[in-house]
């Protein structure tokens, strides 16, 4: 589709500039009537791929119409007879994408239109819970999680799936409130709270200082994977001490099964950014996406394992040339740089209020534009100066500085030690 590149990013690091440009090109190639997964092989709409496309879109095109078309397409018609794309986790991403869209766009009318289909989709999910109120793979379900280079057990109750399920119930409660469904709000809040209360007793392992991967017949497995742990961090489902424990025992621990898809690197690096590790994430972005560029990539791939060489990079699904070399989920630096380096995100729907918390992450300077429903937010930052310009809404700027900063407009207020 013809798209206007409303968002942009530039910095002193030319490799990172190239990563942003190739990410934007990858997104554009995979934007048609809908946000599709890859431009050559599947050309299909998958909910897990799509939610990342939406989030990247909010920092690049701000194309709301393509978001709405894709969300409607993925839902389909009633009665519900399977999960979204038959994949359990993809159903949960579908719920989450609706409220994300509302927060960025402010479009309540769309939520009102979609809410009855959200209810019937959630009824389908609730009808497939076990005696613990949790979800397990049933006949006809694809429990996906990720394309992993190691063994991922899909048996029993996966901690990752329960966390997504819990967030989906919370999302249903928020959407129920938006449409004035008081009974629905109460119902979904109660279900979400009950499930959330079970997460730590069921899956947290004090010895491993992490969520275990799954429970089978009420028994924790020995396996720890990154998935549930990183989602629990940026969903803020754990206290600060446990989040910091996860950072060391899982996210920065090379002995834990590594993620080799940009799909899940998206969430892994988001969790690290949420924990203030932008310097480390910058190195990872340059190594991982820069690694693809060094292999000759002109768009970003479905999967990249730096340990592979030559034509191994082209193989997937048991086929020597099976890999998609232009895959939307490969473009996640667009989102990470907009939200966690320029530091821009909506606080109230449609950017009526927004937060700006820029972090250089090892750069000397950076600047960029983040689109909003009726304008833009422009951010420039170096080690001594910050400039922010917004065309709409009320903004809250947060910076870290040992000394009180000087402002041309307004008076900085101290939030905590070194934070203004």
Describe the function of each predicted region.
Residues 1-127, 132, 136-139, 248, ...:
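Substrate-binding groove/exosite segments of carbohydrate-active enzymes
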Residues 16, 58-71, 102-122, 129-130, ...:
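Structural helix-adjacent loops and short alpha-helical linkers that scaffold large soluble proteins
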Residues 16, 46, 63, 67, ...:
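Active-site-proximal structural scaffolding
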Residues 23, 107, 232, 268, ...:
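Hydrophobic, well-ordered secondary-structure elements that form the walls
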Residues 256-295:
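Repeat-solenoid scaffold signature
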Residues 282-420:
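Non-catalytic C-terminal accessory modules of carbohydrate-active enzymes
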Residues 40-52, 92-97, 101, 105, ...:
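Carbohydrate-binding/catalytic loop surfaces
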Residues 77-93, 126-193, 197-265, 269:
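The feature captures the catalytic groove of carbohydrate-active enzymes
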């Amino acid at each position: 589709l013809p798209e206007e590149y409303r968002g942009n990013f530039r910095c002193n690091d030319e490799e990172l500039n190239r990563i942003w440009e190739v990410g934007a090109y990858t997104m554009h190639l995979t934007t048609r009537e809908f946000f599709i997964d890859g431009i050559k092989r599947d050309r299909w709409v998958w909910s897990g791929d799509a939610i990342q496309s939406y989030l990247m879109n909010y920092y690049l095109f701000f194309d709301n119409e393509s978001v709405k078309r894709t969300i409607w397409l993925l839902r389909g018609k009633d009665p519900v007879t399977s999960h979204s794309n038959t994949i359990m986790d993809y159903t949960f991403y579908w719920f989450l994408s609706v409220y994300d869209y509302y927060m960025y766009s402010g479009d309540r009318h769309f939520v009102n239109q979609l809410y009855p289909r959200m209810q019937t989709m959630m009824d389908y999910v609730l009808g497939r819970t076990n005696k613990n109120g949790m979800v397990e793979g049933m006949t006809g379900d694809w429990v996906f999680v990720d394309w992993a280079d190691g063994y991922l057990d899909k048996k029993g109750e996966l901690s990752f799936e329960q966390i997504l399920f819990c967030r989906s119930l919370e999302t249903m409660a928020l959407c129920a409130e938006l449409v004035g469904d008081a009974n629905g709000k109460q119902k979904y809040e109660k279900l979400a709270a009950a499930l959330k209360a079970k997460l730590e007793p069921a899956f947290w392992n004090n010895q491993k200082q992490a969520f275990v991967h799954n429970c089978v017949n009420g028994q924790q497995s020995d396996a720890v994977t990154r998935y549930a742990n990183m989602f629990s961090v940026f969903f803020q489902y754990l206290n600060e001490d446990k989040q910091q424990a996860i950072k060391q025992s899982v996210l920065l621990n090379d002995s834990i099964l590594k993620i080799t898809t940009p799909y899940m690197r998206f969430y892994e690096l988001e969790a690290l950014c949420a924990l203030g590790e932008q310097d480390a994430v910058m190195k990872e972005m340059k190594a991982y996406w820069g690694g693809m560029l060094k292999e000759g990539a002109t768009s970003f791939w479905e999967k990249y394992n730096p340990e592979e060489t030559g034509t191994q990079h082209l193989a997937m699904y048991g086929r020597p040339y099976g890999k998609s070399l232009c895959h939307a989920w490969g473009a996640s630096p667009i989102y990470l740089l907009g939200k966690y380096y320029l530091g821009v995100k909506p606080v109230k729907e449609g950017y009526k209020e927004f937060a700006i918390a820029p972090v250089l992450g090892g750069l000397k300077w950076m600047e960029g534009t983040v689109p909003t429903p009726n304008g833009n937010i422009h951010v420039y930052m170096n080690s001594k100066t910050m400039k922010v310009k917004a065309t709409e809404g009320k903004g809250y700027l947060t910076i870290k500085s040992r000394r009180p900063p000087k402002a041309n407009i307004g008076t900085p207020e101290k939030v905590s030690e070194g934070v203004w």
